[in-house]
């Protein structure tokens, strides 16, 4: 799936429309996610932070190509219409949403957890202990350090930085940067970690 395969309207830096659904992403996500999914063969992808649904719709479309289960959580429903994807209007921090995510990680085969909610540090550190060997976890609005964000990203790649490597319990949870994918995804303000 390439940029030519879908309706794409750039509105401003950090926001575009995907089939009429607003997405808050760097538009170069389309350069990385298809190859990433092709190379990893995930069984389950879970997103925390649906927002207005554009990125969720894109991941859902990729799920149809690559054959993984996908669902997404947001405590606030900002969707303008009924989505084609499995949207769960629940907290990801506790209660039923938390239990579903833990169950999804535990019994979902090879899992990717996409962390893009209201407190990415909390969400990463909450679920990282449940990851299995060869699972992946990614955080959006990421930079390795604040200095790196100011020097290499702000005003160029992505203006927002809501988590850095030092915030994330990677060593405590046996997580490593995901080979070449970490180097690619930093170009769209996503971290990419895998469980040893």
Please place each PLM-identified region on the residue numbering.
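A short alpha-helical cap/connector motif
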Residues: 1-112, 118-196
